[in-house]
Amino acid sequence: MMRLKQLNEMSASEFIHLLGGVFENSSWVAERAEPNRPYSSFQSLYNKMVEIVETASDNEQLKLIQMHPHLGTNVKITDFSQEEQKHAGLNELTKDEQNHLILLNQKYKDKFGFPFVMAVRGKIKQEIFRTIKERLQNNHQTEFKQALEEIKKIAMFRLQEIFREGENNSMTKHKERVMYYGKGDVFAYRTYLKPLTGVRTIPESPFSGRDHILFGVNVKISVGGTKLLTSFTKGDNSLVVATDSMKNFIQKHLASYTGTTIEGFLEYVATSFLKKYSHIEKISLIGEEIPFETTFAVKNGNRAASELVFKKSRNEYATAYLNMVRNEDNTLNITEQQSGLAGLQLIKVSGNSFVGFIRDEYTTLPEDSNRPLFVYLNIKWKYKNTEDSFGTNPENYVAAEQIRDIATSVFHETETLSIQHLIYLIGRRILERFPQLQEVYFESQNHTWDKIVEEIPESEGKVYTEPRPPYGFQCFTVTQEDLPHENILMFSDEPDHKGALK
């Protein structure tokens, strides 16, 4: 291993400087381990350092234990200890928890004469509180031995951290590898979330806000970082956040979320997760709305919307995506954010044509100057200012319901020459209504029905069936540069002199 080779070849002072903190503020362990180089493996190095501690005098062992800081302390501690306590959430204690831990630490030290030591990597604060209470019941000899055992565990984690960094540097210096893991289908439902109000209204849509009596979301989370490499290459789980923990994290944070949008919730989860787990370098979240529709009930003899009963929708739903990374200075940065509307299916029974396309020996599709058009649409949009997507300033927030209503309105108004033309016009209208958006992206599919009965006596109707399985699709991005006005063919409310719709 490259790092081990470097370790064996570096000077004595470099060796001691690198490993002096493996045992808390006790560089004498590294000093005594240095002359035994070269080491053949990580394990042989660790075994030698443990042997040095085990064969040290009682006084040296006591001083080693006393070098460890109290858990949850506010005084300056080593970088190793700071990171370990941060992983366990000890930097986020409430005032009451902080005072309780101080009291337990003092009781422990008063009884045994040295601080409570515990390898907190992978532990949660509740487990730490429980353990210190249990160990307060032990005698001095038992706790002295237990403290040394915990110190050995801590040393193992710290050595792994040092070797992991070296291995990560050597394995990723040529090309950044794909490396992430996560949890999908994290369903969370919240009743009585803060309502979304103050949204700017537009002519195409009656939408003005959401009451959020019932808020449902399906989240997919993935995380990554160079420190996770050995979880793949060596099965080392010491820095692995279990995906079940991710699920719990997301669901419980919906309870403390004070915002009003899926986009804002994803940002809240991402920020909280990276603050909680400082070794995670990047996080991606996808949120899909689980929509519920209003039902009606008779109240005092009148029909009115029910505030108790809702119907799960099988129709279109809002989506959001967010990617956040940790910078070298430990600040967090959103590298990508996108809002969306998925699963919108629209049928327009007339006023659609498809003519003038290439005809050759492969063409069997007839031209049609007035056909039904059934389209599936996924629409995604990006803001010029990412923070506008969170809904904290509702005047700048663009709701999926408004995007839906613009799409249906433009579809109704426009003499549709093709799906390509339709999505372009919808995108332009969206950007005209919402100049705070940077671009709108479309994924569309053509699911126009096949005609079965051409003419029905004394009726304008026809009979259709589902199309054959292959379907056409289109992808297109509309940007602010597309906004200069052009002539758009639209229906008027009145027929022309020939009886045809303009």
Swiss-Prot record:
PROSITE patterns assigned: URICASE (PS00366)
Sites where the protein binds urate: 243-244, 354, 371, 419-420, 446
Domain of life where this protein originates: Bacteria
Region (Urate oxidase): 179-502
One MF annotation (Gene Ontology) recorded for this entry: 2-oxo-4-hydroxy-4-carboxy-5-ureidoimidazoline decarboxylase activity
Catalytic activity as recorded in UniProt: 5-hydroxy-2-oxo-4-ureido-2,5-dihydro-1H-imidazole-5-carboxylate + H(+) = (S)-allantoin + CO2; urate + O2 + H2O = 5-hydroxyisourate + H2O2
Family that this chain belongs to: In the N-terminal section; belongs to the OHCU decarboxylase family.
Name by which UniProt lists this protein: Uric acid degradation bifunctional protein
Organism: Bacillus sp. (strain TB-90)
